[in-house]
Amino acid sequence: MTQQSPAFIGPAWLEREQLIDAPDPVMLDWLFNQDSLTRRLDRLSDGRFSVFPQFEGWQPLRPDECLALGLPEAGEGWVREVYLRGNGNNWVFARSVAARSALQDGGLDMDELGTRSLGELLFSDPAFVRGTLEVCHYPEAWLPAADAARGLWARRSRFDRDALSVLVAEVFLPALCTAIHDKDHV
């Protein structure tokens, strides 16, 4: 489970049009691509993609998550933190959250995913509607210690199905950037 500072509200999540300091075009494409990240990572790794769970459980959500989900501050939710791995390397740190009340009534068993990809589940159910993609430089303090680094790009979006909303944040780790660059220059 990653740490959070109670006084820190969170990063400024921005839509594409709001970006002043945009990343290079290749990274911009990865950040704002509407397709399933799971499928893209699977292709990039030539089928050697895996999910490595780090934490799953109920806890108070961060202020920026509550705001994005329309919950009162310190609302409780299910938190799932995983690494999305390619070729045995941590490529993406993903944090998915959903409000307790919506999850219990929404028919999505996030607690039973194990090493399965949440993205695959969300993209295989046409009832889920993806909201706007937003990006930021993810706070170093919110990353697992082994991958804590300043200035890593992250994206997030909300998936809605009836009263159920799931907020998914994905942090692109340096090993992913290397893999993308290497694949582009083969």
From Swiss-Prot:
Any GO CC annotation of this UniProt entry: cytosol
Identification of the protein by name: Probable chorismate pyruvate-lyase
Reactions performed catalytically: chorismate = 4-hydroxybenzoate + pyruvate
Family in the record: Belongs to the UbiC family.
Amino acids binding substrate: 80, 118, 170
Database matches in PANTHER family: CHORISMATE PYRUVATE-LYASE
Swiss-Prot/TrEMBL keywords: Cytoplasm, Lyase, Pyruvate, Ubiquinone biosynthesis
Pathway: Cofactor biosynthesis; ubiquinone biosynthesis
GO-annotated molecular function: chorismate lyase activity
Gene3D superfamilies: Chorismate lyase-like
Location in or out of the cell: Cytoplasm
Superkingdom of origin: Bacteria
